[in-house]
Amino acid sequence: MIEQLSVRNVALIQSLALEFGAQFTALSGETGAGKSMILGALSFLCGQKVGPDLIRKDENEAWVSAVFRCDHAPRAVHTWLAERSIEPEHHRVLLRRVMRRTGRGTAWIQNVPVSRADLEFFTSFFIDLHGQHEHQSLFRVAEHRRFLDTYGGLQQEVDAFTACYAALAERRAQLQRLASCEHNRQERLEFLSFALEELEHAALDVHEERALEGEEQKLCQHEKLCDVMQRVDAAIRGVDLQEGALLSSLKKALGALESACGIDGSLEPARARLESAYYEIEDVAHVLRTYTDGIQFCPDRLQHVQERLALIYRLKKKYGGTVAQVLEYRARAQQEMQDLSQAVGDKEALEQDVQRLMAQVLHAGRALSLKRHAVAEAFRTRVEGVLHRLGMASTRFHVQICTRDEQCAKQRTGPYGFDDVEFLISANAGEPARPLAKIASGGELSRVMLALKTVLSSVDEVGTLIFDEIDVGIGGETARAVAEHLQALSEHKQVVCITHLAMIAAHADAHVCVKKESSGEHTNTSAAHVVGERRVQEVARMLAGDTHSATSLAHAQELLRAGARQRRGECGD
């Protein structure tokens, strides 16, 4: 349950602090005073997504905090806290959330930073907040299934069916993609097969191209190369070492230098170097002569080299900019072809998966339908009983479950089973049951929603029920019935209710009055518990808009006494 709520700089609220008792608290105030702002602040603390518009004008941040008592909370709450090393203090935890003008926010539980989603999950174990116009959700037939499943405790079965259904849908989608791509797959396989055959036959080597280009150049310029090499040989060796050739001149110079060394020994190093140069050049001349003698022109070889290079250039243009890239393409093509070739096997496996999952879906769907039919009657009886206590004695409540047969379910089903669930109402004796949207007034819808919340609260562990204007469209004896019902409900749950009806406020254990006051350019919403004479005056205002007339005050006092007697379990008008 929630024990304390503190709000600062939220909308019109500058600063507000409230304490809540364990039973029934009513919030009242003039229209527009800001009652719903208080619940809006609580919704913000409970993880609702909001923007910086929440922040009060001229302020930089808004914050809300609350103390929750958790000694009677579900075991899942304590496990969740322990996993995050959050320790309650005296069975209580402090929740805080801040929203800054920049749009960024921060949240804590017991000074441990948490996410917005953490707040939303954690508080879902404590609070069920019925906001304004939530009764309109009764017009959404899809919500009816959720109500029934919640009452029957079927969420685990629904989740299991949903998971199986999702797996089936995914396998079917994969099969459909395979079927739609079958033609393209065959074309792609044919192309890859041709490309790989072409590349395998080519047997490219990453170093081959450069070698072939060098060989082609030599073969194409054979005559020029031979002429150049002959001239080089003539310059070095001459013809039979004729006069003027390089080697002949060096040999003469070496002989002269040897004579000079006999006169001056310091010339010996120079002679040695010249001698070394002579033999080095002689060796080069031999190498070049051997090279020249080996030059041969082969037209067939030139044709082969040019054809091979033409093939390499064509494959590079077709499959990649370089031979290395062509080889990479070949590797990718081999893998793709392998994957595409496996698609036939994948298709067979997927078809088997679809059959297996369909059998599971049918089994789970049938079991879920049986359980829904089993709990529907008990749910109908309990809701109808609450409606009778809320002044709808002639009303008959029906739970209509339309279950698709197995053949239809194979073709068309949804993630929540084979059943379409809809609540129907017969408001008067003898009238046929009709959808809520066609028969229920605003007051009837509010009471139907209250009945549903009451019945559902008996099967969940949420300790606090919060209602915003659950009394819309009712008055008189109906208001008395709703007030007494809320009071009875508060014996087992903490109930907080925003109300415009004096009858409901008078039956509450505690009464909070919300006011809006203006000072200069600023407007502020405040809230405080009213007791004694102040509570009498507030109930009188709710009755007749008059806080001073003796008649209104007397009527208010009588309502409060009746509410007190009801809380004590005493009989009387």
Swiss-Prot record:
Pfam families: SMC_N. ATP binds at G29, E30, T31, G32, A33, G34, K35, S36. InterPro entries: DNA_recomb/repair_RecN, P-loop_NTPase, RecF/RecN/SMC_N. GO terms for biological process: DNA recombination; DNA repair; SOS response. It comes from the Bacteria. Keywords: ATP-binding, DNA damage, DNA repair, Nucleotide-binding. The keyword tRNA-binding does not apply. The keyword ATP-binding applies. GO terms for cellular component: bacterial nucleoid. GO terms for molecular function: ATP binding. Belongs to the RecN family. NCBIfam families: recN. May be involved in recombinational repair of damaged DNA. This is DNA repair protein RecN. The gene is recN.
